[in-house]
Amino acid sequence: MAEEEVGNSQRQSEEIEAMAAIYGEEWCVIDENAKIFCIRVTDFMDDPKWTLCLQVMLPSEYPGTAPPSYQLNAPWLKGQERADLSNSLEEIYVHNMGESILYQWVEKIRDALIQKSQITEPDPDVKKKTEEVEVESEEDPILEHPPENPVKTLDLKISEETQPETEELPPVAHGVPITDRRSTFQAHVAPVVCPEQVKLVLAKLYENKKIASATHNIYAYRIFCEDKQTFLQDCEDDGETAAGGRLLHLMEILNVKNVMVVVSRWYGGILLGPDRFKHINNCARNILVEKNFTNTPDESTKNLGKKKVKKDKKKNDH
């Protein structure tokens, strides 16, 4: 390793240690080996109006001769507003070339959020949007045949006030991450027998700062209602267009029941096209097989306390 790279590596380590000390749990390690990190930045209010996740990758040349690669993740950030904020970060690099700049980037973003909170209110209907255009795959038959009838999504607001207390939190297992061109995918699985447990699982996952800061958290679940001999099922794209429906279709093909799967994706700045759907479904398939949901789905729910489940405006699939 060249002397300059050794110096950069040491300076990176010192900067990462400082960022973790300053920002605590808000600073998350996505991939330590690839030097990918993220931080959730807010407008510093007790009840933040505006939040943005900054994801950075530190190349070996940083901070000496190259800037960090970065991704700004926020459902409301687009158009000229995104361009202006990106220009501000790049100006900081130009004016501080050769120096460590992550702290300056974070505080510049925070200043922008504080200024925005003083003049505008967030749109309650804003949704996350994928950074990639929809591209159909010609290779994976699962991707070629999404569910014929799109399912409506649950209104799952994750807050202490709305979390049900009568249901038991199911055990949640985490799969092995898949990384491709800086994007990382990881599946999480849990046995569920009612929508309330779906909410509990999501709330538990979102307690993890790394999972909460993912670009997308796609999920689907299938619950078998024995009294009606039908399935209660639902899915959520979380901005990754059509990914939730494709995930649910995979679960239908595998004929799993009483289970939910969440796939977290951390976008690395390089478009993957249709490969992203393959990684999402492969993560899900692997953990369903590993945890034996494809073989003996009933076994995982024996001790969870079954109850009658109402339709509650969800799709019932015979």
Curated annotation (Swiss-Prot):
GO terms for molecular function: actin binding; protein sequestering activity; ribosome binding. This is Protein IMPACT. It comes from the Eukaryota. Residues 14-116 form the RWD domain. Pfam families: RWD, UPF0029. One of its GO terms (biological process) is regulation of cytoplasmic translational initiation in response to stress. Its main location: cytoplasm. PANTHER family: IMPACT-RELATED, PROTEIN IMPACT. Residues 297-318 are annotated as: Disordered. Residues 304-318 have a biased composition (Basic residues). It comes from Mus musculus (Mouse). Present in neurons in most areas of the brain. Present at high level in hypothalamus, particularly in the suprachiasmatic nucleus (at protein level). Preferentially expressed in brain, with a weaker expression in other tissues. One of its GO terms (cellular component) is cytoplasm. Induction: Up-regulated after serum withdrawal during neuronal differentiation. Keywords: Actin-binding, Cytoplasm, Differentiation, Neurogenesis, Phosphoprotein, Repressor, Stress response, Translation regulation. InterPro entries: Impact, Impact_N, Impact_N_sf, Ribosomal_Su5_D2-typ_SF, RWD_dom, UBQ-conjugating_enzyme/RWD, UPF0029_Impact_CS. The modification Phosphoserine is found at S137.
